[in-house]
Structures are given as C-alpha cells and as structure tokens.
Amino acid sequence: MHKYRTHNCNELQISDVRKEVKLSGWVHRRRDHGNLVFIDLRDHYGITQIVFTDQNQQLMEDASRLRYESVITVRGTIVARSNDTINDTLPTGHIEVLAGEFIVESAADTLPFVINTEKDAPEETRLKHRFLDLRREKLHNNIILRSQIISHIRHLMTGRGFTEFQTPILTASSPEGARDFLVPSRMHPGKFYALPQAPQQFKQLLMVSGFDRYFQIAPCFRDEDARADRSPGEFYQLDVEMSFVTQEDIFSTIEPVMYDLFTKFTAKKVSETPFVRIPYNESMLKYGSDKPDLRNPIIIADVTEIFRDSDFTIFRENIKKGSIVRAIPAPKAAALPRSFFDKMIEFAISEGAGGLGYIQFSETGEAKGPVAKFLSPQQLESLKATASISNGDAVFFASDKKEKAAKLAGKVRIRLGEELDLLEKDCFKFCWITDFPFYELNEDTGKIDFSHNPFSMPQGGLEALEQAKTTEELLELTAYQYDIVCNGIELSSGAIRNHKPEIMYKAFSMAGYSEEEVDKRFGGMIRAFKFGAPPHGGIAPGIDRIVMLLAEATNIREIIAFPLNQQAEDLLMNAPSYVEDKALKELSIMLSPSILKNMK
C-alpha cells in the first residue's frame, strides 16, 4: 500500500465498500459526538468523511484533539453510511472511512482565520497567509479554473495554426501608457532594463521574421495603481499577432476563441458570432462609453437641436457656447417617487456635474418635471421620438462640452441600469469597438498625443496624415484600432500595425517626436521595417479579466494565486524590501538622504 494514499478524497464510491484504503489531507472539520468523532478530510480533489469510534478509545481521543488544517494520513475501511446520514452534496457522500489508524504528518498552529467557510477575513490577513487563503473552496476553485482556461486557450490557438513563443522579460522601455518597472544593469552602470509592459515590438518583429501566426500567454508589467479589475505590477494576456491580415481577419479569428471559451466554462448565454461592431463615435453617443455594457437596454440620444431654440435658458446658452445635450431614457420610471430623481441628481453632482435635468411622461402622456415647462408640445413630441421615449418613461439630460456630456450620460446610463434593474441576466454580451481616434489631446500638456497604441496604422495612411493641417483635423483621424468588450469590461485592445517606416516617422512627428527620437526608442523595429515587413495586426485579450468574468469574481485578487495588495505590496514575501548596501554598490545605486532617513 502506498505510503500516503491509495485514493484521493473525492473518488471513493458505494462500490468501494469493504475496501481497505489510505487517505491523506487536511482536517477540514471535526465533530465530537461522545462515542464518535467525525473528521471531514480534505485534499485538492474533495472531501471524505472519516469516522473514529469508541471501539478504539485511544485513537478516538487522539482524533478529538486534532486541530483544524493539520495534515494527517488515515488508514481504514470503507463502510456505507446509514440512509439518514447520506450527504448527496458530496461525491463521496454515500460512504465514510472507518479509521483504523492515523499519522499526523504536520500539526497546524492556531489559525488566523477560518478556512472551512467563505466568511471573509480582513484582506491584509488573507494576503499575509495566502497559503491558507488558497485552501478555501471558492478561491481554490478559481485558481483551478484559471489553469483550465489557459490550457484550453493553448489548445484553441495551436488548433488554429498559431505558434507559441516566449519573448524577453528584460528589454527596453517603450511608451505603452504606464510607468515602467526598471531593472538596473550591473554590467552597464547607469543603464536600466525595463520589464515589458507588453511584448508589442517583439511580436511585430516575429512577423517581420517570417512567422505567420504568433501567440503567447504573456506576462506584462506596469507600474500603475490597483483597481477592482486591475492588479498592480503584473498581469497576463493572450498576446496574438498575424501577418497579411485585415481587421476583419483578426475579428473572425478571435471571435470563435472567445465564444468557445465562454460557452465551455459557463452555462450563461453568450453572444453569437459575429459579434456586434460599433464605431467609437457611435458608442460614445449611444452608450457614453467606449466599453458599453450591452446587457443594459438604455440608448442615449443627442437632443441638442431640440433645446437650441427652446425656452430652457441654461441649455440654450450652453449650446451657444459649444455644449451639447444628451438624453438618457429611464424606462417605466415616471411614477417613481421624488427621492429617486433627487438621488440621481446627487449622483450626477458627485460625478462633477452641476446637476441633472429630467422630465417625467405619465401614462397619459403628460410631461412633468423641472424641464418640461420650458419645451413646447412640438418639442416634447420631437424629444420622445428622438430618444425613443414612451408614456410612463422618464428622461434625464446631460449638458456640457461634448466629451464631458458623453461621459456623464454614460455614467447616468449605468446607474439607471442598476437602479431600475434593467440588465439582462445570465448572459455575456460581446461587441467590438472600432475606428478609434488616432490622436488625442494630452490633458497635462495640451499637445497632440497617441490615443492608444502608437504602432497602429492610421486610416488613410500617409495621405491622411499629410492632409491634416490643424489640431482639429488631426483629432478627427481614425486608426485601425479596436477593442473587444464584454458586459462593459474591456477585454482587449488591438490594431492593424503601421509597418511602413515613412508613415511611422510622420505619425510620430505629429506627436512631437523627431526621427532621431524614434530611431533611438524603436530602432530595432524601424530597422526591421526597412527590410521587408508584411502587413500585420494583432490583439491581446486579458487573461485575468476573462477569468474574472467566468469565475464571477468581483475583485481581480480572487483569481490570482499570489497577488499584490492595493499598495503594490506582497505581504507574504515582504516585497518590495530594502536590500543590502553591497547589492546597491554592485549596481552603482546610491539611495537619497530622505530614503536613508526613513530606513532608520
């Protein structure tokens, strides 16, 4: 018989009765009944009930003293449970093991929190004792699910003719939109490597190298703040690149992968392929966001022209100054109490707005509310037609400069969807957002900057760049840039790449980069493009966000084995930490006086 186990804790059945077995695992629960002691023994696979009787008094007493989470090996005989003790919630619930002997492999100290319930302990305690936290059923299953998802992704990608690669972790800095993690070079004092924010340049270089279909489960490193759906430090993405492809080729390749993944790992309804395509400008108008949650049926409408000549002075004067007005319908909300509308106004103010106008249309069509009296009957009918408002509905208004009004309307739409319980249940709704702006204005400098990936191909190519003479014209340029969105969560950005050096130099020059700067920062890729580069494009869906959705987790730390906390600290391994002076000297690093003072 094996030293530790003949079976795992999830496989013994009624057909195994009278077999002598050996099991090993953790003491999950212990119940003392005087002349009986029951222990639920847990391993990676499941739980089996062990019973100790007073026929072996010493063994039973020893078992009664076992602490939760101690590791034991039990030898015993399988017996059938009585009908009144059968537990159909467990695969092993029809049997139990009558213990003949047990060995304590490792005794557990007093636990800092309870393992055998899903009651949450303080996150700091959980992360400091992550090895215990990972024993809890929900988190343990999330990590298993993550492994299964990644394994299936590899199967799907190789089955579609993709080759898996590993690209360098120590590389050069690149402008991906976040701060780099820098690694000092011992051999080259004063110089630094950067951990890759994404394998962007390497995967494009592989296309130039003649490979056709690349993928990688790629670790990415960005020094950015934590969010519920973003872990500080590192994350993983399904990095994909393809040669000789159009935007639609990328879509038709990735859609079946997403559909297969989501239908395999959930019973919820999943959008049929092809997924809906929504141009960026349309998405910002209808949903007030470039990552719309299509489970929400509310569609925003532009009603600027209706208010341009209205008697509502505030909106009319705002429109004269270049503002717009967006209408956000609230289905079947007209009869709700005043407190609902006051709460929506308070929400808008908390989001930085001056307020939130609204109109209620009764079941008979009567218009009420603070804005209604300023519109003529014809304007009210036009409003109902434009915003698809029916009797019994209410409608809210957001007025500001175009971008601010769109974002406020989008937030109000989301809030209304939640407050009115409008979101379609038990489904995953996918869409593509296309035709992103190529450039944007940097909020800090007021200068032109790339809105997304600087390596995207501008629609219209070099000619479009040369014809754009003003800032306004540059901001109107669009890119072959796209996002895939599911239930309001951006899973990935992607693009058809700019593979022509002359277009790349021109695109960067518009953002204030000289040719020398471009050569210095992206010399390897520019040089490669001068030796025959295929048209290519790619995408990189986030593994962590996919797992979050499929695990129905609300926090990204619930699907990562060893995450950092919100302050980017590893409480288990005590990282980041100070290092010895010798190590700093080898790297030619000297700490500032203020840091040295804090160390003391």
From Swiss-Prot:
Catalysed reactions, semicolon-separated: tRNA(Asx) + L-aspartate + ATP = L-aspartyl-tRNA(Asx) + AMP + diphosphate
GO BP, sorted A to Z: aspartyl-tRNA aminoacylation
PROSITE patterns listed in its UniProt record: AA_TRNA_LIGASE_II
Region (Aspartate): 200-203
UniProt binding sites for L-aspartate: 176, 222, 452, 497
Binding-site residues, ATP: 222-224, 490, 542-545
Name of the molecule in the record: Aspartate--tRNA(Asp/Asn) ligase
Recorded name of the encoding gene: aspS
